Design a protein with these regions (language model features):
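N-terminal basic/disordered segments at the start of proteins
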Residues: 4-8, 13-51
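Structural motif
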Residues: 19, 97-98, 156, 228-229
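Short, polar loop motifs at secondary-structure junctions
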Residues: 47-53, 128-132, 162-165, 182-188
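Glycine-rich, highly charged phosphate/nucleotide-binding loops
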Residues: 60-90, 202-217
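Glycine/small-residue-rich loop that forms an oxyanion/phosphate-binding "nest" at active or ligand-binding sites
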Residues: 78-89, 96-146
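Anionic-ligand binding region
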Residues: 157-204
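C-terminal functional extensions of proteins
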Residues: 222-225, 229, 233-240, 246, ...
Length: 297
């Protein structure tokens, strides 16, 4: 990982408590981490940025690792990062009893790397299944190549799909007047500029938890730019619900980019079922780490 930063929370140690590796963001991650800590687990939580790390309150048994998985060295890959993390846990004599993938549904490279790496190491892997949200006037797109013909000439669009695919979205909708909401990172800004977006139509916003404050900021952005159509990702969970609410309140058209298919061998469970599957840490103390059947990796 790049520029790793470790934050071990203050509080009594749990020398006998088993370890679990959680890969998450700011949506369901903090809630899931708290529930697992309350169940007695020690957690090593991987987040992409320091801003994401601030969503996790310091708690006994919680260790945060900041940085994209597999970005510590030039040419490194997510799979190399997963292998390194799993090997490191054994070296520290803190082997993971479970790995939980609560990463963004569109972080498909991370999920694929976790499936392969955990399969090789025989460490049980679970995927947090985000809900399928319904309701409201939305249009689903299987991929960005379905954007052709969706935009009227001069129609004001807000692209909230992350920076990596901005150029593709702009190319598919040349008739639209594009605006973008991106994370405040140099690479994201470079990608927005490379897509041909002028600086005055790019907003670099720090991620905020879904709620009233975030809604006010992005509603104000839509009003200022006179947005007519929003393109975002069908990620499930707080992020998608947030954009659904904004578009409903402001009367905007909402286009949702369908999430990529996940590996068929990966066991995905809703939050409560996932917690039940992992169980209490006290039930795992003294037991060997159990590999899952091959179809669950």
């Amino acid at each position: 990982m790049h520029a790793l930063s470790f934050h071990q929370s203050a509080g009594p140690a749990r020398p006998q408590a088993p370890w679990l590796w959680l890969i998450a963001g700011t949506g369901e991650g903090p809630q899931l981490a708290t529930a697992l800590l309350q169940a007695g687990w020690q957690l090593r939580v991987s987040v992409v940025s320091r801003a994401a790390a601030r969503a996790y309150a310091p708690q006994p048994g919680l260790q945060l690792v900041v940085g994209a998985i597999g970005s510590s060295d030039a040419g490194a890959t997510p799979l190399a990062g997963v292998r390194q993390e799993l090997a490191g846990s054994r070296t520290r004599q803190q082997p993971f009893r479970w790995v939980i993938d609560a990463s963004h549904p569109f972080a498909s490279r991370i999920t694929a790397a976790l499936v392969q790496g955990c399969g090789e190491a025989r460490v049980p892997l679970l995927r947090l299944q985000r809900p399928e949200l319904a309701g409201g006037a939305v249009e689903l797109l299987a991929d960005l190549n379905e954007l052709g013909g969706q935009a009227r000439r001069g129609e004001r669009w807000l692209l909230a799909i992350g920076a990596r695919r901005l150029a593709e979205a702009v190319h598919q909708t040349p008739e639209a007047l594009h605006h973008a909401r991106i994370l405040p990172r140099p690479q994201a800004l470079q990608q927005a500029m490379a897509a041909g977006l002028p600086a005055e139509r790019v907003a670099c916003l720090q991620p905020l938890p879904a709620g009233a404050q975030r809604a006010r900021v992005e509603q104000a952005l839509c009003r200022r730019w006179k947005i007519e159509t929003v393109l975002c990702r069908r990620s499930g969970g707080p992020g998608e619900a947030h954009w659904r609410a904004i578009c409903r309140e402001l009367g905007l058209r909402l286009l949702l980019l369908e999430r990529p298919a996940e590996p068929g061998a990966l066991l995905s469970l809703p939050l409560q079922q996932l917690l039940e599957r992992v169980g209490l840490a006290t039930q795992a103390v003294g037991e060997p780490s159990k590999g899952q059947p091959s179809q669950e990796f």
